[in-house]
Amino acid sequence: MEPSGGGLGPGRGTRDKKKGRSPDELPATGGDGGKHKKFTLKRLMADELERFTSMRIKKEKEKPNSAHRNSSASYGDDPTAQSLQDISDDQVLVLFEQMLVDMNLNEEKQQPLREKDIVIKREMVSQYLHTSKAGMNQKESSRSAMMYIQELRSGLRDMHLLSCLESLRVSLNNNPVSWVQTFGAEGLASLLDILKRLHDEKEETSGNYDSRNQHEIIRCLKAFMNNKFGIKTMLETEEGILLLVRAMDPAVPNMMIDAAKLLSALCILPQPEDMNERVLEAMTERAEMEEVERFQPLLDGLKSGTSIALKVGCLQLINALITPAEELDFRVHIRSELMRLGLHQVLQELREIDNDDMRVQLNVFDEQGDEDFFDLKGRLDDIRMEMDDFGEVFQIILNTVKDSKAEPHFLSILQHLLLVRNDYEARPQYYKLIEECVSQIVLHKNGTDPDFKCRHLQIDIEGLVDQMIDKTKVEKSEAKATELEKKLDSELTARHELQVEMKKMENDFEQKLQDLQGEKDALDSEKQQITTQKQDLEAEVSKLTGEVAKLSKELEDAKKEMASLSAVAVAPSVSSSAAVPQAPPLPGTSGTVIPPPPPPPLPGGAVPPPPPPPLPAGTGIPPPPPLPGGACISSSPQLFGSTAIPPPPPLPGATAIPPPPPLPGDTAIPPPPPLPGXTAIPPPPPLPGATGVPPPPPPLPGSVGVPPPPPLPGGPGLPPPPPPFPGAPGIPPPPPGMGVPPPPPFGFGIPAAPVLPFGLTPKKVYKPEVQLRRPNWSKFVAEDLSQDCFWTKVKEDRFENNELFAKLTLAFSAQTKTSLAKKDQEGGEEKKSVQKKKVKELKVLDSKTAQNLSIFLGSFRMPYQEIKNVILEVNEAVLTESMIQNLIKQMPEPEQLKMLSELKEEYDDLAESEQFGVVMGTVPRLRPRLNAILFKLQFSEQVENIKPEIVSVTAACEELRKSENFSSLLELTLLVGNYMNAGSRNAGAFGFNISFLCKLRDTKSADQKMTLLHFLAELCETDHPDVLKFPDELAHVEKASRVSAENLQKNLDQMKKQIADVERDVQNFPAATDEKDKFVEKMTSFVKDAQEQYNKLRMMHSNMETLYKELGDYFVFDPKKLSVEEFFMDLHNFRNMFLQAVKENQKRRETEEKMRRAKLAKEKAEKERLEKQQKREQLIDMNAEGDETGVMDSLLEALQSGAAFRRKRGPRQVNRKAGCAVTSLLASELTKDDAVAASSAKVPKKSEGVTTILEEAKELVGRAS
């Protein structure tokens, strides 16, 4: 039998070389080897030293020397005490430390033994060596560690291999660490070789003992790894972890349980780091070898029917893979992959199992998942705030799915979104529900992906519906608030209108009082005057009464005296009566007629003959007829008011003498027609004031027609001449400009056709039967072409055929269906003649005007007479603003309409546009009528545009005067400004210009991080919070800033002018000749209402100007120099800047707070990380000296109890907050950098910027976590 000391041989030569000595230089008492005991003791001490130092020396992969492996030294029966007496105290201490390690004592128990005396230590070492030698001789008398290695390499199979493995497992569990070290890397390599062979053979043919042998090897590995030496040796192998992963076979539950536990223990090892990633790599390699999902064996184990221990082991391995990872993305990715394989449904079944170990693992999984979910949600929320642009987000998503398997699914999602019901109320609810569903899918409550193999998704619909109901209520409240705001504006407008009306009534009442008071004063004065006059009259009456009485008395006396005198004078008067001459007759009595005075001389200077004596009763005698051959002398002109006697016609052959011109006021006498053969003499022009000259008589046959004379300036136009007599030459045509010029005579004046370049031939002239719609292209003429261009080579006539032209005529005919139908009804030769008739030529309108008018009429599809009736009736139900505007724009000029109205008899021969002109030409005063109708249609809109502007400025003026908080802000600004300007020329100010408020941000702080505006905003926040309410009190300042007082005045003046024009048109409008003409009736009422509206607007505008002027006096500025728009624009800008300063102050404080919390969180996270590391090292410290045993048992116990996974929730939450804070800071900095880059480059690359923010934020959050 080989003694125990022989088991220390493997690898010793290699280790001795590393220490700088050869194996032959071992301690010995002599070179002859005579003292066998001392040699054995020295040999034993060297082996113990080598065993002690083996943990700190990396095992080489080369196999030890076989000769050395087979050699062994026997302790024999040497007395141990005698042997220890020959070694030094230092060597005893080395053996004592090795004894403590083999005894598997912890540090607390080792410390008291180290404090013992050297004599006691020597005795203890002696007893331990003696006991160990006896036990080893008893236990390993049959089989040593090297023998196990030889047997494993001998190719045992089936039952023999199973027996060997069971014996090896017992030896590994019962022997001390030194025995395990002797078994070492060679024994481990032998076990792994057998395990690999069994795995490979199992894939081909599986024997009865293969699974049992594999399981027994896993148990041997567990026993081998129950100390730090075994774990390190296992980790140094290349395929050890992979073989453990391959051993996870759900078909062999017990073996899979042990393999999963071993892998779980390896995942939570503190050193080396990232052991869980090595296990994941091994699982990935196995999945690639077997072409399955890497977590599929774990899912199969969790779905196994009976073995609860297997389910616990698989879930324990899942927790061990996820929990140690520091990166949040890594943990979420692993959970997502597991959920995608169906873990979510399996978890529901596992929660129904009543098992303490299962409950521990489920709690660990749920708690860690919830924390990761909140971490991820917080990080994504911060990043999402920077991604509020639809185009950028869509482009990012499109780039991520482009040219991948997800692209058709993304397209399908977009297509389904197009199917959302197009309802104003329902569409937002659809999108809310879709958003919540997507959020719960991609951000599962456990931070994992759903099971994509099952369409069943567990979504909290009830919670979503409740939230949607609440959001709907909020939206309804917001809509109601908006409606109330509109009502408030309307009430405010009505209040201003009532104030203006009330002020007007007050002014009218005061004016009426003043008028009545004036009338009263006038009546009082008149009454006083009447009373005075009455008194004067009474006095005069009394005076006159006395005089009358006196005169009456004198009259009586005179009568008496006359009576007496008359009696005395009777006789003398009778005798002298015959000598008195006869008195002339009174006017109006009959008597001799006094001859009239002679008439005035004629214009030629001839003296007229004396008039004959008048006949009785004043009857005039007509003049005698002229003598034969004598000159026809006209009678003398009649006096004013007498009846004109026409002269007799001249005798044949006599020369016609024109009558003298009539005197002013007389009726013009038409001249007689000229005699045959005589030259027609034009009549003289009438004298000023006389009536128009009648048209000249028609020329006699054979005479030459003389054109009528032109009318005198200011006189009426001449009527058209009568038609000529038969046989007489025609009347010469009118001069150019008075009508359509006649066509040139055929056959005369046609120039020769020019020769076309490049061999071009003139294009064929087509004559369609009806006019077609004409394409509006840019025509090329021959001079525009070049020799090599395309158009010189075209031969379009090869496509010419009658069928093509017929189709074109049918499809693009410019005539309406009605006219075509009428033509179809006509039969025989008339139908053919109509079809061959040429296109109707324009007679009055030019082609452009006619075309524009035709296009306009084509958009209405109304008969012309109906359009006329609508305009006459002023039917606002049919008339629109655009229609009237186009009518005014396209309507021909009045002269053209007058000319078209004269062609009424030729209506059917006119073009459509001219037919419309004929119909509309019958409407009296058409253009003024259309302008008035247009103004009526636009009036309400004008009022609605002007009134809100007046109300906004008026309300803004009142708000500024009443706002106490704004006044307080001005006071604070004045205080701060005077303090800052102390010692300068601007110190001691009593006030400042309002425009200075916008310049507050120009004054920066010393550190350039704050402005005076930010300081005032922060001052108001801390000490005067009520002042922050002033923006709400100036609600109408924004609307007032958009009002131009100049434009407002112009609009009012324009409205006044338009109302006056309409009123004048209505007054001057002729009497209606058509019963449908309602223009005057409707416009009269409109003018009255419009005038009232205008007066109201004018008063409101006057009130606005008064308030603004008072505001200028209040804030000390000149309203004439500072317009309404400029003043309120400054206030509006200051209001916005103040609100922005408040937000920036809040953001700055939040940033400082985040930085402070991030710093504290970082320090705390580092502290927690160190504590966590220490806790993990408490399980096992792989870097500590010594060969600690029971390591695997401790790890498995920590995994089972959940102690290996426990961590305080506080650090994770703090880390999340810290990560969010740092993410926000980084995102803001990157945004600023992007903004600067964008301002310089003008065209930033949006997708790259967003990706950079995501990557940097993700990296930073991972570091912070």
Swiss-Prot record:
Database matches in SMART domains: Drf_FH3, Drf_GBD, FH2
Span of domain GBD/FH3: 84-449
InterPro entries: ARM-like, ARM-type_fold, DAD_dom, DIA_GBD_sf, Drf_DAD, FH2_Formin, FH2_Formin_sf, FH3_dom
Domain DAD: 1187-1215
Chain positions with Phosphotyrosine modification: 1114
GO cellular component term, pick one: mitotic spindle
Subcellular location: Cell membrane; Cell projection, Ruffle membrane; Cytoplasm, Cytoskeleton; Cytoplasm, Cytoskeleton, Microtubule organizing center, Centrosome
BP terms from Gene Ontology: actin cytoskeleton organization; actin filament polymerization; actin nucleation; axon midline choice point recognition; brain development; cellular response to histamine; cytoskeleton organization; ephrin receptor signaling pathway
N6-acetyllysine, modified sites: 1050, 1096
Keywords: Acetylation, Actin-binding, Cell membrane, Cell projection, Coiled coil, Cytoplasm, Cytoskeleton, Hearing, Membrane, Nucleus, Phosphoprotein, Repeat
Residue ranges the record marks as coiled coil: 474-568, 1141-1185
Record-linked Gene3D superfamilies: 1.20.1170.10, 1.20.58.630, 6.10.30.30, Formin, diaphanous GTPase-binding domain, Formin, FH2 domain, Formin, FH3 diaphanous domain, Leucine-rich Repeat Variant
Residues that span the membrane, as ranges: none
Tissues where the protein occurs: Expressed in testis. Present in Sertoli cells (at protein level).
Pro residues biased stretches: 594-628, 645-742
Residue ranges with Polar residues bias: 67-83
Ranges of compositional bias, category Basic and acidic residues: 54-65
Region of interest (Disordered), residue spans: 1-42, 54-83, 573-742
Domain called FH1: residue spans: 625-757
Record PTM N-acetylmethionine, positions in chain: 1
Family classification: Belongs to the formin homology family. Diaphanous subfamily.
PANTHER family: PROTEIN DIAPHANOUS (PTHR45691), PROTEIN DIAPHANOUS HOMOLOG 1 (PTHR45691:SF4)
Domain remark in the UniProt entry: The DAD domain regulates activation via by an autoinhibitory interaction with the GBD/FH3 domain. This autoinhibition is released upon competitive binding of an activated GTPase. The release of DAD allows the FH2 domain to then nucleate and elongate nonbranched actin filaments.
This protein's name: Protein diaphanous homolog 1
